[in-house]
UniProtKB/Swiss-Prot annotation:
Its main location: membrane. This is Putative multidrug resistance outer membrane protein MdtQ. Could be involved in resistance to puromycin, acriflavine and tetraphenylarsonium chloride. Residues 1-21 form the signal peptide. It is found in: Cell outer membrane. It is a lipid-anchor.
Length: 478
């Protein structure tokens, strides 16, 4: 080997020794794979599905100002939304804190120290008062001020990976806020339409009670005239008492719903003063296929996906910790034993330092941190895969229930039409003078009972359709 090639080899030897001396990274179990990663799914809907798909503000489709106002109040004032917002701000602040570690830092410092030197210590000569020797002891007033700078070189990408992990957490928290928003809106809408269903049922029950009172009045008149016995009107009295009990139950349910709406909307007044409105008509506009290709529109799956991405970046940061850390430091200062000399040019001092930290033996600490990062990542992936399967099942169950209730409502509508025809025939016979007016009331009561059953089915369909909207992501777009 000639001299020209010998010196470069000697110069590279410390670098090779540094890399070879790093703590060894052991093999770990294989990472889990994501089931339909949400980031790879297009959120744009096929043209055939756009008309029947929920919008991000799907509740506006009901064209109900009361409902819109309740949901807006919930989104603005609900504690759950405030918690979600603060979680985002915390994640953003943590991401900024990690990002600042990747740049240079410059500090200014100044200090002054008054001290007496010991004549018997290491600095004993400075305790003497000998101007010729440059000592004016034993008292000195030392002063220092200047700039110090430092820069941690992120050669292996450790800080960049940590920043990416934090940003993934920020995106996950934002998706969680949207999920909270959709859950709140869905809860308010379901309670609101349940209240409207009970209000409509209350109206029908009052009509039934009115018809029953008509029959009771007729039976009493017949009994007073000696035409019927006292036993003939007992069944009608019992039915009227049951109707009154149902009215009391409905009133109690409405009060409970109002209390729950007050809690969700953080309403401070005693009463919401809701006004009854007609229930929306039953309709079915479901997409033909509800599969994995549409799951990216669910905020909870987006949040789970970003937690997975964050965990993968955490693994990269844990791997980068096995390699050397390189730090650059510099200072430019004024330093003097006496304050009178502090601002002289001769009191200036400066320097540059390059530091290297090489992990060689760490008792397995770095490998343990890497194992933890990989285990947490696998847990995030497993949780994501579980959420995907549950999301598909949620959509399938909700869609099936909506379709079943839509069919039940159609059958119930036919039953109500048949019952109304019976009422029409009784009314015609009454108009012809064939039967008494109480017989018309007797014909109306079964029809009103069927109307009550229809309202309950209609309310169940509304509740199921709102739950399906939530299962479909509520129109969320990342």
């Amino acid at each position: 080997m000639n001299r020209d090639s010998f010196y470069p080899a000697i110069a590279c030897f410390p670098l090779l020794l540094m890399l070879a001396g790093c703590a060894p990274m052991h093999e770990t179990r294989q990472a889990l794979s994501q089931q339909t990663p949400a980031a790879q799914v297009d959120t744009a809907l096929p043209t055939a599905l756009k008309n029947g798909w929920p919008d991000s503000q799907w509740w506006l489709e009901y064209h109900d100002n009361q409902l819109t106002s309740l949901i807006n109040n919930a989104l603005q004032n609900a504690p759950d939304m405030q918690v979600a917002e603060q979680r985002i701000q915390l994640a953003e602040a943590q991401a900024k804190a990690v990002a600042t570690q990747d740049g240079p830092q410059i500090d200014f410092s100044a200090d002054m120290e008054r001290q007496k030197m010991s004549a018997e210590g290491l600095m004993g000569p400075f305790a003497l008062n000998d101007p010729a020797a440059g000592t004016t002891g034993p008292w000195y007033t030392n002063g220092t001020f200047g700039l110090t700078a430092g820069w941690h070189l992120d050669i292996w990408g450790k800080n960049r990976a940590e920043v990416t992990a934090r940003l993934g957490t920020v995106k996950a928290r934002a998706a969680e806020r949207e999920q909270t928003r959709q859950l709140l809106a869905g809860s308010v809408a379901r309670l609101y339409w349940e209240w409207q269903t009970q209000a409509a049922l209350n109206t029908v029950l009052q009509q039934i009670e009115k018809e029953q009172n008509t029959i009771i009045a007729t039976d009493r008149q017949l009994y007073q005239n000696g035409i019927t016995s006292s036993v003939d009107g007992v069944e009608t009295d019992i039915n009227a008492s049951k109707t009154r009990q149902q009215l009391n139950d409905v009133a109690g349910k409405m009060k409970i719903i109002e209390a729950r709406l007050n809690a969700l909307t953080n309403h401070q007044t005693k009463s919401l003063k809701l006004k009854p409105v007609a229930l929306p008509k039953v309709a079915s506009q479901l997409p033909d296929e509800l599969g994995y290709s549409l799951l990216a529109r669910r905020a909870d799956l987006q949040a789970a996906h970003w937690y997975v991405e964050s965990s993968l970046s955490t693994i990269d940061a844990a791997k980068a910790a096995f390699y050397p850390d390189i730090n650059l430091m510099a200072f430019l200062q004024q330093d003097a034993l006496h304050l009178s000399d502090l601002f002289r040019h001769s009191a200036q001092q400066m320097g540059v330092t390059a530091g290297l930290t090489l992990p060689i033996f760490d008792s397995g600490r770095l490998n343990a941190n890497l194992d933890i990062a990989k285990a947490e990542s696998n847990l995030s992936i497993a949780s994501y895969n579980k959420a995907v399967v549950e999301a598909v099942n949620d959509v399938a169950r909700a869609a099936s229930q909506v379709q079943t209730l839509a069919e039940k409502n159609q059958h119930q509508a036919q039953i109500e039409r048949d019952a109304l025809r019976v009422v029409g025939l009784a009314q015609a016979r009454f108009n012809a003078g064939i039967i008494a007016g109480s017989r018309v009331s007797e014909a109306r009561i079964p029809a009103l009972r069927e109307r009550a059953n229809g309202l309950l089915l209609q309310g169940q369909w509304l509740d199921a359709s709102i739950r399906l909207t939530g299962a479909l992501g509520g129109g969320y777009k990342r």
